[in-house]
Every structure is written in structure tokens, then in C-alpha cells.
């Protein structure tokens, strides 16, 4: 793999490629595992391996390297957010919103701990990447039985306060335990003023396109 990158003049980008593909891998694991935990009467799931396989050839497919050490794009604490005995879950219809919409999430929990969680209080926070809190509150307080698909409540947030493109994060935690999980979503202005400027945009190479290209060549 190193030689292939070097032959294509990308040897210096090895770390960037690993981090990009690794973050995507971790996100896929998160969504796949959460999907199984949200499925009624699902009997469980199995992961073939968590580490890279270096036997007959090389398969760099693990979230850990061949020595069972972290690669740098996800750690044990982050993995346990969506893969542990107690996992808060969210049913979110979509992850991209306009600011004239309302964000909504139905909150559930998958709990296969040693005993039910008596009088468990579930809270939530919505914040941006800088830590600014836009909304927070309590989802509900109830005893959480052993099993999956225990409904806890819902979260709603009017997005009109968001007037610039933002990535926000919903975090849900069950107080008094280490059960916490989070999800990113994106908000964009519903109305955007477009400035034509000097950039010509087209998906067809026609006479008008050639005119703009020739004008650019003349100016250059």
C-alpha cells in the first residue's frame, strides 16, 4: 500500500486517507449497530473482528490495528456510546434541515444490564461544534426495563434561531449511569441571497460556455 501511494505521488497523504476512511468506518459501525438495537425482537449482532487482519495477505478492516491498539480516529469510550450494555437511541427522520423547520427526535434506549434502571432520568443537550448550547432539557424520568425499544420521550427544537449554516449535535444521557450517545445534524438557511458575481456555472458545454471560456482566455 505504501508503494502504491508513493508511485502515485500521494505518499504524504497516507495519514489523511486513513483518518478519512476510518471516520467513515466508525460512522457506519455506529449506524449499523444502532439500527439493530432499534429493531424489535432482534436477537443480537456479531462483529467478525475489531482489529486488522494480517494473515493471508493484509486486510486493514479493523477499528484497531493488528496489536489491538487504537488507530486514532475512534477510542473505546466513543465506541461504547453506541455499543455497550445500555445505549440511548434516537429515531431522527433526517439529518439535514432548513431553519424554517423543527428538529424532532424520538428517544429510546436499549438496556441489557444486570438489572432495570430504577427512576432513571434522561436529559438532552443540543450544541454547536464550539460548545454553544442551543437547547437542553429532560426527556423523561422512568424505570428502564431490561430489553430494547423502551421509549423515553422526544426532543423538539425550532430551528429559526440558526441563521447561518451550522453542524449541531444532539447528546442524550441517562443520569447516574455512563450511558450517553450523540448524533450530528446540519441546519441551513431556508432563504439564501444568491450573488451572480463573475462565475459562470453550467452543466452543458454549449456556445454560451465557449463564449465565457474565450473571454477568460482573452482576459488572461
Regions found by a protein language model. Give the residues of each.
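Beta-strand-rich binding/interaction modules
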Residues: 102-140, 166-175
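Substrate-binding clefts and catalytic carboxylate motifs of secreted carbohydrate-active enzymes
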Residues: 1-118
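Intrinsically disordered, low-complexity Pro/Gly/Ser/Thr-rich segments with frequent PxxP/GP/PP motifs
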Residues: 133-163
Amino acid at each position: 500500500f505504501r508503494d502504491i501511494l508513493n508511485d502515485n505521488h500521494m505518499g504524504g497523504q497516507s495519514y489523511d486517507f486513513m483518518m478519512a476512511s476510518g471516520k467513515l468506518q466508525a460512522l457506519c459501525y455506529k449506524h449499523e449497530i444502532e439500527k439493530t438495537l432499534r429493531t424489535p425482537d432482534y436477537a443480537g449482532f456479531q462483529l467478525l473482528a475489531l482489529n486488522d487482519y494480517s494473515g493471508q495477505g493484509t486486510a486493514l478492516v479493523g477499528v484497531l490495528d493488528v496489536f489491538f491498539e487504537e488507530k486514532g480516529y475512534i477510542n473505546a469510550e466513543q465506541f461504547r456510546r453506541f455499543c455497550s450494555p445500555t445505549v440511548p437511541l434516537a429515531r431522527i427522520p433526517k439529518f439535514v434541515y432548513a431553519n424554517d423547520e423543527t428538529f424532532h427526535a424520538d428517544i429510546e434506549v436499549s438496556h441489557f444490564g444486570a438489572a432495570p434502571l430504577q427512576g432513571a432520568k434522561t436529559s438532552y443537550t443540543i450544541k454547536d461544534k464550539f460548545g454553544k448550547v442551543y437547547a437542553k432539557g429532560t426527556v423523561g424520568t422512568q424505570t428502564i426495563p431490561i430489553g430494547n425499544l423502551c421509549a423515553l420521550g422526544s426532543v423538539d427544537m425550532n430551528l429559526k434561531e440558526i441563521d447561518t449554516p451550522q453542524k449541531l449535535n444532539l447528546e442524550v444521557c441517562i443520569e447516574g449511569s455512563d450511558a450517553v450517545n450523540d448524533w450530528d445534524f446540519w441546519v441551513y438557511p431556508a432563504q439564501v441571497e444568491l450573488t451572480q458575481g463573475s462565475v459562470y456555472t453550467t452543466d452543458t458545454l454549449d456556445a454560451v460556455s465557449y463564449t465565457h471560456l474565450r473571454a477568460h482566455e482573452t482576459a488572461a
